[in-house]
Amino acid sequence: MEDIANPERTKKILKRYGFKFKKSLGQNFLTNITILKQIVEAGEITKDDDVIEIGPGIGSLTEQIARKAHQVLSFEIDDRLIPVLKDTLNHYHNVTVLNQDILEADLPTLIAKHFDGQHNLKIVANLPYYITTPIMLHLLEAGLPIDRMVLMMQKEVAERIDAAPGSKAYGSLSIAVQLHSEVKLAFIVPKTAFVPQPNVDSAIVEFVGRQEPLVTVQNQQLFDQLVRGAFAQRRKTLWNNLQNQFGKQEEVKAGLVAALDQADIAPSTRAEQLSIQQFAQLSDCLNEQPVFAKKRG
């Protein structure tokens, strides 16, 4: 039987079920078999792996994963696609499809129920553009024993995730992701590979989980506030952005001056010039200032 992703078979499946794409769900189905196989290769998927897939669509990528993996657990939010998936994937007995929103799913419980715990846990997904960041951060911060993730997303977002300090793309998202994972932008997927065709190209990003966060800080909440505030207005200096974030009262200014001096960071520095380690150091210096005591926790 032809691969699900074969353009002609994809058209037949969509026609048979009278499927209409929902823009609100960011539905774009990949119909390039070569790229699908490259995604599976990027995940280094073998029979030693259990795989969570997000957004299987009509099963094009699911099929390729199922041929390599031990078990596959797919989350599909669109209930119209459930009967389609039961049809297209009925030959793959190692696939379970759940009609659930990944952001609302109790992942530890579901993993324990559907996987035996004896295999590596990997995640592969073609993420809808409109909800890429929430899903990605949800997975990274869930505390799951993820060995490897391979996510397809908008090229611009991928470049921000993979960005280094000093680059225009470097920002709070770069830091949030790189704290938890080593990141690599693997390859670009042209918009012509999808049905319907999106407006922009996509990219495949590989994530390898860190055993420990890249940095540890005394106060994670304060660190998050610091990073968020520092990048709030990219053209402004760290000094201006941090006053806007924490306040312009004299005691706050004094605390900021002391912390910046202790961390050996000039107030005129811009956020994109700081490494993650420097942000961690500055966060700990702020945490030692009495004026920031109320922000601890």
Curated annotation (Swiss-Prot):
S-adenosyl-L-methionine binds at residues 28, 30, 55, 76, 101, 126. Gene3D superfamilies: Ribosomal RNA adenine dimethylase-like, domain 2 (1.10.8.100), Vaccinia Virus protein VP39 (3.40.50.150). It is found in: Cytoplasm. The gene is rsmA. Specifically dimethylates two adjacent adenosines (A1518 and A1519) in the loop of a conserved hairpin near the 3'-end of 16S rRNA in the 30S particle. May play a critical role in biogenesis of 30S subunits. This is Ribosomal RNA small subunit methyltransferase A. It catalyses: adenosine(1518)/adenosine(1519) in 16S rRNA + 4 S-adenosyl-L-methionine = N(6)-dimethyladenosine(1518)/N(6)-dimethyladenosine(1519) in 16S rRNA + 4 S-adenosyl-L-homocysteine + 4 H(+). Its EC number is 2.1.1.182. CDD domains: AdoMet_MTases. The keyword Cell division does not apply. Keywords: Cytoplasm, Methyltransferase, RNA-binding, rRNA processing, S-adenosyl-L-methionine, Transferase. Pfam families: RrnaAD (PF00398).
